[in-house]
């Protein structure tokens, strides 16, 4: 592997892209299997519900989290909140707005309404993360200013 193929995460760009795609699949499988587990239990099949739950947990706890570690998905709290704001902003400003418009243009009013409802929820998420970022930044400035240094774990 040549140096120009190595990303800032120490892996090739193609491997990183493959890991991210795999993570999307694992996350979707987790959510889908949790839904299937609930449905199986509603139909009286606890054994099948347990199988779906067990598989869902493995998809998340092993596959997704191990892949997330390889791509260094999580960073500092401030980085993670900034990433969350970016994702929520995209959903509010672009994704769900476009989806609602397209559904309405196709005559799928119920789908358009659902996308608009979700868009409003995402706007609340966006605001909550923006407020969290302000608190993080204020806390960090206060801690650095009052101690004259960054706080360490042994300080608490």
Cite the ranges covered by each PLM segment:
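Non-heme di-metal
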Residues: 2-156
């Amino acid at each position: 592997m040549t140096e120009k193929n190595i990303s800032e995460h120490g892996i090739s760009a193609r491997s990183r892209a493959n890991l991210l795609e795999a993570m999307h699949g694992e996350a979707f499988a987790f959510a889908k299997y949790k839904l299937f587990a609930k449905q199986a239990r509603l139909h009286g099949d606890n054994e099948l519900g347990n199988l779906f739950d067990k598989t869902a947990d493995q998809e998340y706890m092993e596959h997704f989290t191990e892949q997330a570690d390889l791509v260094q998905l999580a960073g500092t709290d401030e980085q993670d909140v900034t990433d969350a704001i970016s994702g929520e902003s995209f959903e509010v400003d672009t994704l769900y707005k476009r989806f609602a418009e397209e559904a309405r243009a196709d005559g799928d009013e119920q789908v358009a309404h659902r996308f608009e409802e979700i868009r409003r929820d995402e706007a609340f998420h966006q605001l909550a993360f923006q407020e969290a970022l302000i608190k993080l930044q204020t806390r960090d400035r206060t801690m650095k200013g009052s101690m004259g240094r960054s706080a360490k774990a042994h300080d608490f």
